[in-house]
Design a protein with these regions (language model features):
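Jelly-roll (double-stranded beta-helix
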Residues: 1-213
Length: 213
């Protein structure tokens, strides 16, 4: 499944501790109610306009990066733009923005049930790049410029979301028909004249066999 998520699709809601607001990009499972229900992962973006304390999420881990503005001070340590950082959700964090226009991007995911990675990427004008997508959920968040895949195009602030099924969920006929290995190769393009900067967030549920081993 491939879908384009625009800022108009995001759900704006207060932080868990009430000290700010965030735009929820995607919550899994979608039937969960944040923050009262347990969830597997949540992708969101928030404008940080003043000092605050981060909401705490015991049992979860978090990826965080800045995609607009000068960065953040997290417990007196600088988080620069496009430099994702991983930390435990229960860690007390005092946050201070280094400019008035800071906007972050975050992924919160259930420890022991989900693995996650966040990387900052870029494409020069008219450049294309091939990605091999592992089974799981992939989010390509466009922070600057334009990002295109097949017939879909994301502008700044929009997200391309791709779910890749695991091979064991496909029968033999489907694997042969769709050429599973080839299908998982994705080409991202920058159709614009300016550099594109984006984030790739990859999340995968940990299998029962991995948990028990």
């Amino acid at each position: 499944m491939t879908q384009l998520l625009k800022p108009s699709d995001y759900i704006t809601m207060p932080w868990k501790n009430g000290q700010g607001s965030t735009a929820q990009i995607h919550l899994v499972p979608e039937s969960a109610q944040f923050p009262q229900d347990e969830f597997l992962w949540r992708i969101s973006s928030a404008q940080v306009s003043g000092e605050n304390q981060f909401s705490q999420f015991p049992g979860y881990d978090r990826w965080l990066s800045v995609w607009q503005g000068a960065g953040l001070l997290l417990n007196e340590q600088k988080l620069e733009a496009f430099a994702p950082r991983l930390f435990a959700g229960e860690t007390p964090i005092h946050c201070q923005p280094l400019s008035s226009d800071v906007i972050d991007l975050g992924a919160i995911f259930r420890r022991g049930q989900v693995t996650a990675q966040m990387t900052a990427e870029h494409l020069s004008s008219q450049q294309s790049r091939s990605f091999t997508l592992a089974p799981g959920s992939h989010y390509f968040f466009c922070a600057q410029g334009h990002l295109a895949i097949e017939t879909l195009s994301a502008n700044s602030g929009s997200t391309l979301h791709i779910d890749v099924p695991s091979e064991d969920r496909l029968d033999a006929a489907t694997k042969a028909k769709t050429q599973y290995e080839i299908k998982n190769k994705l080409v991202l393009r920058n159709p614009g004249i300016q550099e594109t900067r984006f984030f790739h967030i990859y999340l995968r549920k940990i299998s029962v066999s991995e948990i028990s081993s």
